[in-house]
């Protein structure tokens, strides 16, 4: 029984390494889409990330070796960078919308009639 588990681990590591490399490529594509403000590519990247997360979860963390652990850490770091970029972009958009439309809950005097 231990032999079958030993044989399964390299195949799992190979599949995991492949999935992690694909995830890194998707995260790099996501970063480019964020920089270009390309909503269509962001949606595609999100869909691809979700599928890869499912594939990686099916393999499980027990298949991690030094190589796959390093790939997983790289993917995590790229995802964190993308999260920060997304948050900055969202804050920028929110600030611009607020500047254009005013804060919610404040009296808008832009279109009020002039006082005589």
Where are the predicted features?
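Short terminal interaction segments
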Residues: 2-6, 68-116
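Extended, charge-rich alpha-helical scaffolding segments
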Residues: 1-73, 77
């Amino acid at each position: 029984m231990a032999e079958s588990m030993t044989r399964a681990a390299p195949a799992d590591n190979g599949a995991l390494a492949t999935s992690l490399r694909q995830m890194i490529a998707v995260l790099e594509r996501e970063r480019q889409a964020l920089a270009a403000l390309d909503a269509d590519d962001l949606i595609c990247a999100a869909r691809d990330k979700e599928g890869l997360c499912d594939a990686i979860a099916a393999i499980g963390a027990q298949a991690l070796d030094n190589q796959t652990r390093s790939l997983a850490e790289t993917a995590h770091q790229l995802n964190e960078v993308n999260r920060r970029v997304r948050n900055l972009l969202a804050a920028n958009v929110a600030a611009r919308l607020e500047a254009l439309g005013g804060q919610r809950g404040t009296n808008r005097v832009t279109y009020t009639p002039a006082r005589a």
